[in-house]
Amino acid sequence: MQEIQFTLTREFIPLCDLLKATGVADSGGMGKVLVADGQVKVDGQVELRKTCKIRENQIVELGDVRIHVLPIDANEA
């Protein structure tokens, strides 16, 4: 399984934007399709809301990819 660590730059990121930002989806539109198809899990549960707010310490899974969402870097805030 591929593990990706993503550090937030603000309080949350919409799910479809996270998929695009991590390169899991080629575009925001593709991210929305993946979510709508029920292929994405957030903290182990299928998530169908395309703009679900993903916050620190959540885990997003798509196929064999797992994204760990890290808190905002205090040095950059």
Language-model features: where?
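A basic, amphipathic helix-loop patch mediating RNA/tRNA/ribosome contacts
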Residues: 13-56
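A detector for short, charged/polar N-terminal pre-domain segments
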Residues: 1-13
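Generic alpha-helical hydrophobic packing signal
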Residues: 7, 39, 66-68
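C-terminal structural segments of small proteins and small subunits
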Residues: 49-77
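Intrinsic disorder/low-complexity signal
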Residues: 2, 16, 42, 60, ...
